[in-house]
Amino acid sequence: MDKRHTEGQICETILVEYLLRLDLYVFQPVSAHGPVDVIALSAEGEMYLFDAKKNAERYVPERGTNHRIHRVLSPLQKTLGVRMAYVDIATRDVHIVPALPELKK
């Protein structure tokens, strides 16, 4: 399997674990190709759609630091309200854009 596909699957798996730890109900679409990688539902009935991406950074000389490379949502993803989930495979950190609201526990 292509390394990028493998890393994509790892990112989705880490995202699923992250969302489960937030006490969300988590689902994955059957289709391998589509605008959404992961669907999550809160106990209050709120639905969240995610596109999982491997976190990538670029060095910005003017700032002297690395900065996340933000991916662009497709027009369909924008219409659906998909959130981008950047996953760091090495640290298992997940950064969601736009951020999730404070979830009740």
Predicted regions and their residues:
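Acidic-basic catalytic patches of nuclease active cores, encompassing PD-(D/E)XK
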Residues: 1-29
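Conserved catalytic cores of phosphodiester-cleaving nucleases, focusing on short active-site segments
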Residues: 15, 19, 38-40, 44-58
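A generic structural signal for alpha->beta connector loops
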Residues: 23, 46, 79-81
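Short histidine-centered beta-strand/loop micro-motifs
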Residues: 28-30, 61-62
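Short acidic/glycine-enriched loop/turn segments that link adjacent beta-strands
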Residues: 32-35
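Short, charged, amphipathic alpha-helix that recurs within catalytic cores of restriction-modification
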Residues: 55-83
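Domain-level recognition of nuclease-like catalytic cores that cleave nucleotide substrates
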Residues: 78-105
